[in-house]
Amino acid sequence: MKKNSLIKGSIIVACMGFLHSCYFGPISDPYYVPESRQQENVYYVPSSPNTQLLSEKNDIGFDLVASGGSKFSGVETQASFLPAKHVGLIAGYSSGKNDDGSNTYMKFHKFEGGVGYVTNLSKGWHFETYGGVGTGKIDNFHATGNSKVDLTNFFIQPAFAVSNKRKTVQFGIVSKFSGVNFKVDTTFDNARELYSTSQVISLHDQPFHIMWEPGLVFQFGWKSFLFHTSYSLSADLTNSQLHRATDNFSIGGALRFNASKKVIQ
């Protein structure tokens, strides 16, 4: 009886092993990370146009906006000041991330500052052009590790705008060109994340890229406070295959005032 029981037990174990080997269900941890997961990690994020459209000496502006686009959402603060009739200063800081509510795939922050020329072309028409430099960092959280992208850039940003007499309604067109230098450091598994590896290799081979970011700016409200919104696209003129955020939509508020002291006659 014991011998028969052993034989029956062996047959059952063998059948279970055979059936298990024939199971074609999903694999919980595939060797190769799906490309869709790898594409949650991005290597460049554009900021919204820092085009506050100030026009008078000693004008000061502050913007606070929520921004978002393909593969990111964030917050931006911008400031500008006209210390002279035709001279302007700008600065901007942006930060954000790409997540799905339970997993964070990317975080970034970026700072830019510049100086520019400002003039009124005719009644209601405004022109400005700013140039400056910036720096930033992108941290990607891959399925098998991490990557860090350090960015430095210089830019030029001309803009035309039209406004009503009180400058409580303004519409502008901006065209920003940036030269961006990428420096990448990685710790993820190159063999398992082939798409991400190809992106990193392309940045090592060509670390300097020219970006073109045309956009529209619209703001309306009162003399000292305006609702502000903008939309811009981002095109990589050096390597269109670089996986990046390709647009930026922002909405928020803008404070405006003039720092000139009033003289009582």
Descriptions of predicted regions:
Residues 1-22:
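Sec-dependent bacterial lipoprotein signal peptides
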Residues 33, 74-76, 80-81, 90, ...:
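Outer-membrane beta-barrel proteins
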Residues 142-250, 254-265:
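Outer-membrane beta-barrel transmembrane domain signature
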Residues 81, 86-87, 92-179:
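Gram-negative (and chloroplast) outer-membrane scaffold detector with strong preference
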Residues 63-79, 94-108, 121-123, 165-168, ...:
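Solvent-exposed loop/turn segments connecting transmembrane beta-strands
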Residues 22-61, 261-265:
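Outer-membrane beta-barrel biogenesis signature
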Residues 55-59, 84, 88, 92-94, ...:
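Flexible, solvent-exposed coil segments and beta strand-coil junctions
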Residues 26-27, 54-62, 73, 85-87, ...:
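Outer-envelope beta-barrel architecture signal
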